[in-house]
Amino acid sequence: MKISTLAVVSAFAVTAIAGPVRPDGIGSDKYLIELGPGETQWVTKDQKHHMRAAGKTFIDITDEFGSGFTTTEVVPANYPKSARHASLIKPLIANLSKENLMRDLTTLTKFNNRYYESDTGVESATWILQQVQKIIKDSGVKGAKVEKFTNQFKQFNIIATIPGSSKSTVIVGAHQDSINSKSPMKGRAPGADDNGSGTVVILEAFRNILKSKAIQAANATNTLEFHWYAGEEGGLLGSNNIFKKYKADGRQVKAMLNQDLTGFTNNGKPEQLGLIADNTNQQLNEFCKMIVKQYASIPIVEAKCGYACSDHASAHRNGFPASFVAETSYRNTNPYLHTDGDVIANLNFNHMLEHAKVVLGFMGELAMAPNL
């Protein structure tokens, strides 16, 4: 275990507490981050931003200091080896709309930024919440709901639920926040790719899965959740809060798919999807490969992105099987991330449709999977 700033870090907590505890000599301006299993460091908020700008990934675990957090055995799951519900899912895929993606992303990128501690970060989250509320109302699906999951910072998480007949839960998530690494609070951060693209992809998938006859008839075996996370750019803050809570509550999360960066295609080079192979669940990754082969039109290749590179890591460290399908084989190919240049003009909406196909395939197949 690597310890810095003269602090002895002995344990972590399951759930966030009202006021983070800090050891003697560590001021309120310091945050505890985890850069790898057992590798922790106390840093300032500015240092966190500089580390993210330099490509260093981590989880902010300040709220876990001194409270006995332990890793958990992975929740067991039994994934289908082949697609069994193409007749239900392919009509939904055919109804996916590139125009919806463009419209929603245009609105989302008009906020000055979606930084998790800024007023516009709250305004953008409120806009997403309102879209989800409208989608549910228009669908007429009984039992479908959306709620806020609040954090200790301004921006809130959003959780939409489609109930199934079992307690087993399948999740797709995307972080909603954006950041300008040079000026986090006030700087322009349209965040079109990072991660407006993932935000609107799962919004469009949610819009269409509610049109499923099986969902409308309440025939889903497993509960589905769509998550929009706050504060990813601060160290996976919102997603870690959720999955710590789910762990403490004994939730049976059988699968989590992360959608972060879904629109950049590396200047016209052959398109592919990137399946992140590190800090993910191998069995679920194999299921993702099958889903891509069955429902997408481009190939998938394995890649690595390091510890805590995105919100799937929050599920993974809390014992829930997680996968991450990104836009390319190498996560950082988009040179505009965390700048005012991360704009819609750099994105490929056809590529984003491929991600939406994968999300619908993933959620549709697992919604109906028996004995998951």
Curated annotation (Swiss-Prot):
EC number from the UniProt entry: 3.4.11.-
Any GO MF annotation of the entry: metal ion binding
First and last residue of the signal peptide: 1-18
Binding site for Zn(2+) 1: H175, D194, D260
Compartment annotation: Secreted
Keyword Transit peptide: no
Cellular component, GO annotation: extracellular region
Glycosylation site positions: N95, N195, N219
Cofactor(s) this protein cannot do without: Zn(2+)
One Pfam family per UniProt: Peptidase_M28
Cofactor: how bound: Binds 2 Zn(2+) ions per subunit.
A single BP term in Gene Ontology: proteolysis
Disulfide partners: C305-C309
Keywords tagged on the record: Aminopeptidase, Disulfide bond, Glycoprotein, Hydrolase, Metal-binding, Protease, Secreted, Signal, Virulence, Zinc
InterPro entries hit by this protein: M28_fam (IPR045175), Peptidase_M28 (IPR007484)
CDD domains xref list: M28_AAP (cd03879)
Positions with a binding annotation for Zn(2+) 2: D194, E233, H338
Family indicated by similarity: Belongs to the peptidase M28 family. M28E subfamily.
Functional summary from the UniProt entry: Probable extracellular aminopeptidase which contributes to pathogenicity.
Subunit structure: Monomer.
Name listed for the protein in its UniProt record: Probable leucine aminopeptidase MCYG_03459
Organism annotation: Arthroderma otae (strain ATCC MYA-4605 / CBS 113480)
Lineage, highest ranks first: Eukaryota, Fungi, Dikarya, Ascomycota, Pezizomycotina
